């Protein structure tokens, strides 16, 4: 890692599970007998906006009670000390930002942002409850979570930035992702095809095509190799 010039870091749900953030696999994927994919989609919001917002407020409360762990902190401190690092995360919890990471490409959006359903304007939002559904301060129309839902596309500017990092990377550090969620899975494969060395940190089995696989918790391994 010390010899790497251009590093692409890709993080998934696994880096935040050590902070207590649910992964939505198995029982954690259910809320009031509904599976998370039944709520995280445009059709569900159009039909039941109050229900979807209630679920997202519950998610905010859960994440607000969590703290960035040693892996988040190690990545943030390491990135601030050097140039040439791009962090792309599949997570929406905001823990990288809370750890002080200087620049995060959050592919799937953020729990802590609202977006107007009419004009598209986004704003930061920390509310954990709403007495009434949130509306845009710009136009007064209904806001939604600024999250990329099922059946939606990742914003083009985030994809372009990520692809540029893939093309320039000589090293890819993959932390806590199964390797099946697109487009992050394609980023890893593309970087490896371009000649980058892929290092995976994950205590669980994954489909990441890594040159080096470290089967250890990120909170134990990253503070060691990034110092």
Regions from the PLM with identified roles:
Residues 1-227:
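Conserved catalytic core of sirtuin-type NAD+-dependent deacylases
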């Amino acid at each position: 890692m010390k010899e790497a010039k251009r590093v692409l870091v890709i993080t998934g749900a696994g880096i935040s599970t050590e902070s207590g953030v649910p992964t939505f696999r198995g029982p954690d994927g259910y809320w009031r007998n509904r599976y998370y994919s039944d709520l995280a989609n445009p059709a569900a919001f159009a039909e039941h906006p109050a229900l979807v917002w209630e679920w997202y407020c519950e998610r905010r409360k859960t994440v607000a009670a969590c703290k960035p762990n040693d892996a988040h902190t190690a990545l943030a401190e390491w990135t601030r000390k050097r140039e040439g690092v791009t962090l792309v995360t599949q997570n929406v919890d905001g823990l990288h930002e809370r750890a002080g990471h200087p620049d995060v490409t959050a592919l799937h959006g953020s729990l802590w942002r609202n977006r107007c359903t009419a004009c598209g304007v986004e704003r930061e939002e920390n509310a954990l409850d709403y007495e009434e559904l949130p509306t845009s301060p710009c136009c007064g129309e209904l806001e939604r979570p600024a999250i990329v839902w099922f059946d939606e596309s990742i914003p083009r500017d985030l994809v372009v930035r990520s692809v540029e990092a893939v093309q320039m990377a000589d090293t890819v550090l993959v932390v806590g992702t199964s390797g099946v969620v697109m487009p992050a899975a394609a980023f890893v494969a593309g970087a490896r095809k371009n000649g980058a060395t892929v290092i995976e940190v994950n205590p669980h089995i994954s489909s990441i095509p890594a040159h080096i696989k470290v089967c250890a918790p990120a909170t134990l391994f990253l503070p060691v190799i990034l110092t």
